[in-house]
């Protein structure tokens, strides 16, 4: 199964509370933090919510 590497590229300062909560749920705590998650609809939806704060790469 494919995996996603999610990297926080922008600060959440000034963002809405639900965006901060989504970043925390993804496991991103600070700028340039990266996590690798399974490519599942749940994670895709979370990434879509904070797409302006993160970058996503597919990893094998």
UniProtKB/Swiss-Prot annotation:
One of its GO terms (biological process) is translation. InterPro entries: Ribo_uL30_ferredoxin-like_sf (IPR036919), Ribosomal_uL30_bac-type (IPR005996), Ribosomal_uL30_ferredoxin-like (IPR016082). Keywords: Ribonucleoprotein, Ribosomal protein. SUPFAM superfamilies: Ribosomal protein L30p/L7e (SSF55129). One of its GO terms (molecular function) is structural constituent of ribosome. One of its GO terms (cellular component) is cytosolic large ribosomal subunit. Part of the 50S ribosomal subunit. PANTHER family: LARGE RIBOSOMAL SUBUNIT PROTEIN UL30M, MITOCHONDRIAL RIBOSOMAL PROTEIN L30. Belongs to the universal ribosomal protein uL30 family. This is Large ribosomal subunit protein uL30. It comes from Streptomyces filamentosus (Streptomyces roseosporus).
């Amino acid at each position: 199964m494919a995996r996603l590497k999610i990297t926080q590229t922008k600060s959440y300062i000034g963002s809405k509370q639900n965006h901060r909560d989504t970043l925390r749920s993804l496991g991103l705590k600070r700028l340039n933090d990266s996590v690798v998650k399974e490519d599942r609809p749940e994670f895709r939806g979370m990434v879509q919510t904070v797409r302006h704060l993160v970058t996503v790469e597919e990893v094998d």
